[in-house]
Amino acid sequence: MGEPFVGTEAIASGRMTAYQLRSRCVAIYPGIYVPRDTALTAKARAKAAWLWSDRRGVIAGRSAAALLGSKWLEAGHPAELIHDNRRPPNGIRTRIDHVEDDEVTVLSGMRVTTPARTALDLARRYPVDEAVALIDALANATHVKMADVELLVDRYRGRRGIKSARTALDLVDAGAESPRESWLRLLAVRAGFPRPRTQVPVHDEYGVLVGVFDMAWEDVKVAADYEGDQHRTDRRRFNRDIHKAETVTGMRWTHIRVTSMDREADVIKRIAAAGVPRT
């Protein structure tokens, strides 16, 4: 994949002519180009936005999460910067915000908010459910400790969004391996069920690993998995799922398999019917 670059710098260095720039590349932000066949990612947008800022902005929010290794980030979202330009082009969101030196790291020469500061920004600037899914993915990728994020919550006590940030951070679980796993866990918790443990291994009587549940209430031997399209289209995974379901049923587990076709109310009924008590 072609990396974003500053058009005038490419011409000045002799890397390409003005004609080649116009004919072979496309501007994604003013003055910032990529080769025409480039499939933009969230990481590429983040770098392009940083270049647009004359390399002065601090990459933040979703863009920081992308550079820090988070999965499941759609390329179509605007890049996010902490930067003093209040009139960014389409595709970039800027905000003027205070950021301490210990809240910034450097990745490939770019200033990026640390995992803890990124988690705080996501928690205070997005709706709770969306923030939880984003921070789940960030925590899964970076192993950021919520205690470190809480220190920043205390640092910025009284700032806008801190109250909702506390709500989101209390619901985060780094064990979620997809946004829909986050959704399923939040659905269960909000329905009044105890918070499940995530990524729970289950072994047979010989100690052989049968599989790993997305989440489980081990005291009542109830587990839930969210099964996306890959569970159906990947034949090897499909076969593993069948084997796991048959084996754990024989071990007296209740295994709840959830797909995009399931209604929320029905999922809640299935969890309750399986014997998970409400708190």
Feature map (PLM): residue ranges:
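Surface segments flanking catalytic/ligand-binding clefts of nucleic-acid enzymes
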Residues: 7-11, 15-17, 55, 96, ...
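Short gly/ser-rich loop at a beta-strand->alpha-helix junction or flexible surface loop bordering the NTP-binding
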Residues: 1-163, 179, 277-279
